[in-house]
């Protein structure tokens, strides 16, 4: 549990848990407390391929507030949602698929509002940036459904005090929203 292969997004929760999307190993590594040494093995892994109808899952994005967890299954065109922090064998509460989601990558959330950066989106958000877009769910999904809105660019972002701070893929543009985008 210490050999990563093409790690994607990482998140450190306020209570010290560390989650790493270990893309080429089709899993999310979980340390239940912050590692104290380099190369320290994870406490366990969440095997994301178990929860999608595709050969690989290739998790790229991961988000958590210490309770809820979101993981992208990029190759499977799916997003996995847990309402409570999962153990190694806990299935997600929601496996979200949508014809609008292509290859989901980055995740931003405040525990209710969810933004999903997508390099190969389909549907209404295809525009000046080609297929790069960010899907928006204005409330935590409780079932598989299409996004509520979209932003015509793939953003890596953060939410603070109900404001969005984002950088477009490639780093050429910054986005600031004084309110959550709907």
Labelled PLM ranges:
Residues 14-15, 25, 66-67, 76, ...:
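Residue-level signal for tight coil/turn positions that link beta-strands
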Residues 1-13, 54-66, 100-109, 158-169:
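Signature of short aromatic-glycine-proline-rich micro-motifs recurring in repeat-based ectodomains
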Residues 26-28, 77-79, 122-125, 134, ...:
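Structural signal for beta-propeller blades
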Residues 17-19, 68-71, 113-117, 165-166, ...:
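Conserved beta-propeller blade signature
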Residues 31-39, 82-89, 136-146, 179-182:
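Short loop/turn segments immediately following beta-strands, especially the blade-tip
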Residues 1-2, 40-54, 93-100, 144-160:
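Surface-exposed loop and turn segments in beta-propeller and other repeat-based domains
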Residues 27-31, 105:
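Mobile, glycine-rich extracellular loop/lid and propeptide segments
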Residues 23-24, 33, 74-75, 84, ...:
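Short loop/turn segments immediately following the C-termini of beta-strands
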